[in-house]
């Protein structure tokens, strides 16, 4: 059965991409709109005609409210984009590899469902933001095209190897286009897997898809490319520093977290200050002087990783059954998001003792995110320490999860696991708690 919008388009000879003038009846008023006809969403009821206005936004007009429609220009077939093996290069510019993994920075609207889907190749992304060619000679490479919720540890390994390959072949830096939802996990993973890092590795994404007027994709990519040729030889996340298009912040890969579902400045450095502010015009203001500096030497990949690691959140009413299930299923490590300073219910402690006795590494973080785990303050914490829990200082739960998987990839000796978890490898542990970083 045809929907109303399908019949309307057929009756008036409308095609997707046609430029039309629509007269809409609204009470006694008549309102005129001009725009491009968009494909009807497959899953919509089909009661509206969708057109894209010249400001880039889409509007839906009820079919029953349309008093007249005129085709101003029929859609023209879009020219096919030509792809070349070698993109234009300029003498004297540094070289940057862009690794494409998907995500919103490389996405378009799927008009069949109305959802956002990964779409651009790395080359399309580079061509969509020509400003980056004035910053560096760009070598794009598409590794995979997924949304970040589909990211897996095996993909982290591939990204790490491709990044190291580029850096060891005389590239000046690497930019990784990545979805924002799990970008913090990937940034942490690369921070541990890329050893002896001598050049910048920058993860970048966007909160608004590339075809939206409010997209932050272009500015984020420009700023990310600026940081990729900078002096900071760190794994960084570069995203908007505030909601307007002024500057981006470069966050250390082990201390950064997505803190808002939709704001463009969603990423925050937690328990730490960002490495730098970076403006699209190339200005960089370093906010700290202890960042790793660009240097010489070959980047090494240490991608050993134990995937049987889980995060367990503590909440009122939680029982030890969840923890026991993980132990019985052969998990090698458990990161607990404890309450406050790092606590669990007292009746869960026997299950934790059993887990440790069975060789399972149990680590404690705080679901507060800000602040530091301290198991020496209250009796519950002291019991957890006695049970063998490893307090993870001020590490983010996500970072602790990634680090524990990486550590267990190297050893299953719990004494060595404790030593490695409490060793600061990539800035994941700050030496003291800074009070000026709370909710900044």
Swiss-Prot record:
Protein name: Glutamyl-tRNA(Gln) amidotransferase subunit D
A single GO BP: translation
Gene: gatD
EC number(s) from the headed UniProt entry: 6.3.5.-
Top EC group: ligase
CDD domains xref list: GatD (cd08962)
Complex and partners: Heterodimer of GatD and GatE.
UniProt keyword list: ATP-binding, Ligase, Nucleotide-binding, Protein biosynthesis
Gene3D superfamilies hit by this protein: 2.30.30.520, 3.40.50.40, L-asparaginase, N-terminal domain (3.40.50.1170)
Protein function: Allows the formation of correctly charged Gln-tRNA(Gln) through the transamidation of misacylated Glu-tRNA(Gln) in organisms which lack glutaminyl-tRNA synthetase. The reaction takes place in the presence of glutamine and ATP through an activated gamma-phospho-Glu-tRNA(Gln). The GatDE system is specific for glutamate and does not act on aspartate.
Domain of life: Archaea
Catalytic reactions on record: L-glutamyl-tRNA(Gln) + L-glutamine + ATP + H2O = L-glutaminyl-tRNA(Gln) + L-glutamate + ADP + phosphate + H(+)
Keyword flag Manganese: no
């Amino acid at each position: 059965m045809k929907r109303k919008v399908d019949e309307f388009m057929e009756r008036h000879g409308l095609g997707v991409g046609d430029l039309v003038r629509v007269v809409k009846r609204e009470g006694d008023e008549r309102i005129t709109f001009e725009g491009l006809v968009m494909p009807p969403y497959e899953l919509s009821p089909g009661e509206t005609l969708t057109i894209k206005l010249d400001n880039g936004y889409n509007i839906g007009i009820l079919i029953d409210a349309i008093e007249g429609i005129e085709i101003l220009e029929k859609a023209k077939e879009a020219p096919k984009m030509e792809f070349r093996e070698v993109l234009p290069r300029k003498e004297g510019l540094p070289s940057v590899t862009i690794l494409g993994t998907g995500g919103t920075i490389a996405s378009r609207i799927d008009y069949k469902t109305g959802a956002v889907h990964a779409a651009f190749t790395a080359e399309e992304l580079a061509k969509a933001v020509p400003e980056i060619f004035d910053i560096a000679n760009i070598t794009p490479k598409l590794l995979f095209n997924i949304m970040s919720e589909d990211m897996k540890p095996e993909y982290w390994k591939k990204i790490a190897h491709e990044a190291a390959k580029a850096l060891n072949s005389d590239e000046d830096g690497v930019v990784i286009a990545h979805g924002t939802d799990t970008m913090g996990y990937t940034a942490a993973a690369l921070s541990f897997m890329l050893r002896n890092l001598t050049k910048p590795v920058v993860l970048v994404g966007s909160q608004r898809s590339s075809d939206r007027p409010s997209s932050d994709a272009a500015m984020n990519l420009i700023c990310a490319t600026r940081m990729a040729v900078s002096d900071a030889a760190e794994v960084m996340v570069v995203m908007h520093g505030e909601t307007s298009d002024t500057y981006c912040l470069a966050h250390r890969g082990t201390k950064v977290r997505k803190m808002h579902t939709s704001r463009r400045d969603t990423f925050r450095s937690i328990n730490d200050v960002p490495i730098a502010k970076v403006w699209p015009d190339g200005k960089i203001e370093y906010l700290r002087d202890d960042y790793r500096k660009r240097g010489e030497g070959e980047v090494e990949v240490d991608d050993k990783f134990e995937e049987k690691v889980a995060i367990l959140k503590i909440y009122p009413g939680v029982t030890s059954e969840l923890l026991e299930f993980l132990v019985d299923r052969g998990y090698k490590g458990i990161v607990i998001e404890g309450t406050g300073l790092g606590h669990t219910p007292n009746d869960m402690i026997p299950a934790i003792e059993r887990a440790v006795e069975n060789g399972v590494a149990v680590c404690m973080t705080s679901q507060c995110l800000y602040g530091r785990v301290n198991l020496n303050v209250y009796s519950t914490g002291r019991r957890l320490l006695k049970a063998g829990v490893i307090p993870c200082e001020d590490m983010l739960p996500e970072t602790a999860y990634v680090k524990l998987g990486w550590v267990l990839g190297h050893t299953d000796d719990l004494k060595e696991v404790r030593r490695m978890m409490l060793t600061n490898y990539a800035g994941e542990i700050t030496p003291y708690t800074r009070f000026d970083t709370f909710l900044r």
